[in-house]
Amino acid sequence: MTVTDPEKLEFIHGLTKDVPHGRRSFFDHLLKTAGVMEKLCKDISINKSRYLIDAALFHSIYGTSYFKHRSDVTREKVTLIIGEKAETLVEFYCNLPDRQIQILQHKFKPDQLQRDLYMLEYANVVEQSVDDVQSTGALNPAKIFMMRLIRANLMDHYNLKMPPLPFNFPSK
């Protein structure tokens, strides 16, 4: 990742470097998710993307219904580091029960929030899938479905010209 402020990286690294996340560190997952988001924003020409990249870097810092990370970091401190818009998105994302289902229901207003949640979840699932392929050589069918569905929703609801998924799927 090229555009992340060293202060943000140092802060998130200090909070997450020793926290496991599957086969690797939580920090590794957060950093690579931000990298996926950065590339996605560039590929679909989202110019004001800093808050999305920062939100991806911190996307599970408060823990989620899927990842039970807890730290003593405050919303105020995170807001100082990544800004109010990114932190508000992170806090909302972290506190959504059954997050993937709720995001896929396309029920959040304003439309910008819904789009940002789709993008954050997409970056998260793509990053985890890349790690799965690198570690095991296989893709989880549920993640394939999730990536395809979110990608389709971003194209259909927001007219975004999404890049192809970074995987080759066998045709049936």
Q: What are these regions, as identified by a protein language model?
A:
Residues 1-172:
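Metal-dependent phosphohydrolase cores
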